[in-house]
Amino acid sequence: MSASLTAEQKDQKSSVKRPLNSFMLYRRDRQAEIPTSNHQSISRIIGQLWRNESAQVKKYYSDLSALERQKHMLENPEYKYTPKKRSTVRRRHKKVSPSSGSFVASDYVVLQQIAQSSKTLKQTEPEKPVNEEETLAALLAPALSYPKSGKSNLIETSELSCLSSSPMIRSHTIPSLSFTDQVSTTISTLDKSEQAPSSLGIYYRSPSSGSPIGRTKSVCLANKARIVPKRSMSSDGCVDKSYQMSKTPSLEANLPQNSSNCSARRVPKFDSKGTVSEQSNSDSPELSADKVLSHCSPIDARPSTPSCPNASISPKTPNTGDHYGFDGAEYLGTPLSVGSTTAYLYGQETELLSTPYCHTSYPAMSRLNSSSGYTCVSSSSVTNSGHTENNTWRSDEQSKGFVDINSFSQSLFSNGNYEFAAHSQELDDLFSQITDFTSTDPIASSLKDANSLGPSLLEPWLPNSNLF
């Protein structure tokens, strides 16, 4: 009994139809107006009418179909749509008979009749506000055409009209600059850059790293003297003193004003035998500025063998508080000549210092201590005139924080024909002193990393036997 009931329930479930959609509801209402009994003709005619309906009519039937679905859900809560499987046997397509064109023509007649009846109804009804959608549907209704192939010419013409009515894209032709115009534009840009204020800075970036390379005052400088050389010899970080003095005929005009006795500065002059004949600036007016102070001469980057023409002259122990050798005043620390032997003007005395690099600041011995991690502390005081009043060293600072290399430096620079291999043992002793140095001084104790210091980390001009 239960099995039979379940079979009946299954039959009832299978017999439940789907709820009608908006088009089917529209077809149910308009089907009575069509006199034809052919379902294909009815579907074609009603489909054409549905496409020409206004949005209000379509919205009405869509709301009606939503109510129909809710009603169907209440009546059949267990209903679930399962699409039917297609049969494996394919049906053969029936050939269109020549008589099929006759009832298609009848469809046109029916559409024209429906359009005429709608016009007569509108004429009898009172006038209403004009609706654009209804007017468009009324205009399209009599002009409908339905070809045999099933494709509407109306769609094709609408596509063509859309293509023709689309706005044309104007091709704006930009006149390209000729080569002469580009050159003139570049020249005018460079002329403007020369007139730009010097306060404007331009940064350049490296193409590989992306970091800024440097800063220049302007792209093109009309005054070439504003370009500072790479290796500046000035102590205050300004334009190089030697470069300025080489451009002026008078040597005493650009000397520092805070120096007490600038004319008493002595300039060493070497004769053909190699002896030093000192002579003041006032006694040698024929000495040109470019020979006295020359910074633009080529500089050899390789360490050359130092040679001193006079063996009796040796560098003195520095009496400065910093490792660059400046006494606090404006110091004219520029070399007198570029070469292996370089003389520096310092105070009122002429101190000869032999260094392979002309850009090394005076004195070289203090730079050795700065590179090795130790500092030279001096008790000398500096006055406004730039001269040291007290030239004494504190014994405790000298014993704790300073490596005495006077004996080594005298033997190092006294011989004119110096060979690095001959003094390799002395260099090793010096490096061993720096490496094994220990002190309780707070300045030296804060530099514990000096134990890992090797000869390669010292100043580049320091002789090293491993390089040769």
From Swiss-Prot:
Pfam family, one: HMG_box
Positions with biased composition (Polar residues): 249-263, 274-285
Keywords for the protein's UniProt record, in alphabetical order: Activator, Cytoplasm, DNA-binding, Nucleus, Phosphoprotein, Stress response, Transcription, Transcription regulation
Positions of modified residues (Phosphoserine): 209, 211, 218
Subcellular localization, as worded in the UniProt entry: Nucleus; Cytoplasm
SMART domains, A to Z: HMG (SM00398)
Outcome, altering residue 173 to A: 100% activity; nuclear accumulation
Region (Disordered): 1-21, 249-290
Organism domain of life: Eukaryota
Coiled-coil region list: none
Modified residues (Phosphothreonine): 173
InterPro entries hit by this protein: HMG_box_dom, HMG_box_dom_sf, SOX_TF
Induction notes from the record: By nitrogen starvation.
DNA-binding residue intervals: 16-80
Post-translational note: Phosphorylation results in inactivation.
One Gene Ontology MF term: DNA-binding transcription activator activity, RNA polymerase II-specific
Kinase keyword on record: no
GO cellular component, one term: cytoplasm
An individual GO BP term: induction of conjugation with cellular fusion
Protein purpose: Key transcription factor for sexual development. Activates the transcription of the matp, matm, mei2, mfm, ste6 and rgs1 genes. Binds specifically to a DNA fragment carrying a 10-base motif 5'-TTCTTTGTTY-3'.
PANTHER family with a match to the protein in the record: SOX100B
Name this protein carries in UniProt: Transcription factor ste11
Gene coding for it: ste11
